[in-house]
Amino acid sequence: MSLPKNKSFKNDEYSNIKFYQPIGLYILDCQSPLGAIPSLKNGKLDPWDHIESTMGLTTLGHYDAAKLGFNWLFNNQNSDGSWFSEFKNDQVIQANKQTHFSCYVTVGLLHFFKITKDIDFIRSNWQKASKAINFSINLQNTNGTIPWCINEDNLPDEDYLITASSSILKSLECAMALFNILEDKDKAKLERWEFAYNKLRQAIRNPDGLFDLKISRKRFSMDWYYPVISGAFSTFESKDFIKKTINKFYID
């Protein structure tokens, strides 16, 4: 199956789930029998894109395939809660460990629960998801920042990406929501996550000198909108933030 053809929106057709079904079929066509979903058909897989694709399957009603995607993910989780950065044909091809990759599983799981209400599936993977969150926040510095990865020598990289950090912040929010949904009784865990969330949120709100130390990323639009969708800012602040930056990236 080939990629869906480009098409323009007409009237309200994009609000009908049928409009998106070809996307779901394409993701299914890319998924391996074991559940892996590469970023490109027959290409490499990274865990963040894999989770995004799994969420696409959930949205379009392919619940068993989505579960298979989560199962692949947890079957390939490292003992420290992380995932390696890239796979191909279920083999590791990039052995660093990106911190926002591990956290993002909670976004996928909360999304799956919101649609399916399958709390048993969430509960069966909760310990592994909690371990994934802890992998990232274990690396948090006193200023709130979290290294973007552990390199192949198992050392923290000395840079902190605003995009990755924004993703981690949203993932922590979803983790705490799942904690309450599952009625987890480990209050120490929740307090630790709340502390990490607040420290990271403060860093994202006051980013000067903290992020993207090795290379300027001001020309990348995602570095401007990721902090907005992370939840670090209020609605009013977000609108003001967008007004100040939209002319740099918006093309009429």
Language-model features: where?
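Low-complexity, Ser/Thr/Pro/Gly-enriched N-terminal "stalk/linker" regions
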Residues: 1-48, 59-73, 77-83, 136, ...
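Extended ligand-binding clefts on enzyme/binding-domain cores
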Residues: 14, 43-46, 124-127, 131-133, ...
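Amphipathic alpha-helical segments within well-ordered protein domains
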Residues: 54, 110, 173-176, 228
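Long, acidic, intrinsically disordered low-complexity segments
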Residues: 1-6, 46, 52, 112, ...
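Short coil/turn linking the two alpha-helices of tandem helical-hairpin repeats
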Residues: 113-117, 176, 180-183
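Aromatic-rich carbohydrate-recognition surfaces in CAZymes
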Residues: 46-141, 165, 169
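Acidic/His metal-coordination segments adjacent to aromatic residues that form catalytic metal sites
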Residues: 83-95, 147-160
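Amphipathic alpha-helical repeat scaffolds
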Residues: 25-28, 51, 55, 228-229
